[in-house]
Amino acid sequence: MPISAETADTRVVARDAVVNTKIDRTTAKTREVHDIASRNATTRLLVETANDPIVVAVLFAGGKGAMNISRNGKIGWGNGNFLVRSRPYFLERGITTAIIDAPTDQKYDLRHGFRGSANHATDIGAAITHLRSTYNLPVWLIGTSRGTNSVVNAAVRLAADSADGIVLTSSMLTWNEKGDNLLGFDLEKISGPVLISHHRNDESRVTPPEGVRNLQSRLTNGGPMKVAWYRGGYAMGNPCHAAHYHGFNGIEEQVVSDIVAWIKQTKP
């Protein structure tokens, strides 16, 4: 389901955020580019608003995580990512989406330690605060693959700026040479709702299904928690890429539908 912008204008909605608004005549009500000041850097968000939204979901792609979002909202990298390509399914169900890009001082690659850093959590906290105040809605973080490192890092480190809940899809569950895995974080500090979504046949060596049990056992101090398992779909190409079971290829709508149902069930 393509997203096509028809008209555009630019406005300032907050002291630290410039927004470029584009009216969408398909799924999204509006399409906006927000530049959020944090530390000595800026983090860009591509926000697509739903009709009568109930939540804002910040989407964290995997891999290098540098989306290269342009000023007019074009995504330069990662269009095939599970969460990025599934935006219409969220929008149809009343979830406003915000794709988060890499900050300007780390704009080429979030791997090799940045996803687990205090600076990254600070940037995410600034985005949460901005979105919550701009839209007056709960804010959830949803990550896939390496994006789950970013989500968990924020959930562990943030207090007042924390999200209302998190969703972890195709979670990073083993040591790897390019970054963190979730079991290395202080998971016991997570206090909000958590949904874990995983494919039974995920063949990526860094997101093994058998690791979910260890993740689940560490999430002991939070709110509601659920593990959702999936089968089916299609497996194409690299097992660690988005066209394989790792990216829920062919069953995207079902996975998103379940995520939204969980959010509605647990949101304040």
Label the model's feature ranges.
Residues 50-92:
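Short, surface-exposed "cap/lid" segments of acyl-processing enzymes
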Residues 129-189:
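Primarily recognizes the serine-hydrolase "nucleophile elbow" in alpha/beta-hydrolase
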Residues 82, 86, 108-134:
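Alpha/beta-hydrolase active-site loop
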Residues 87-107:
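Conserved alpha/beta-hydrolase
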Residues 165-230:
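The feature captures the conserved acid-bearing segment of alpha/beta-hydrolase catalytic domains
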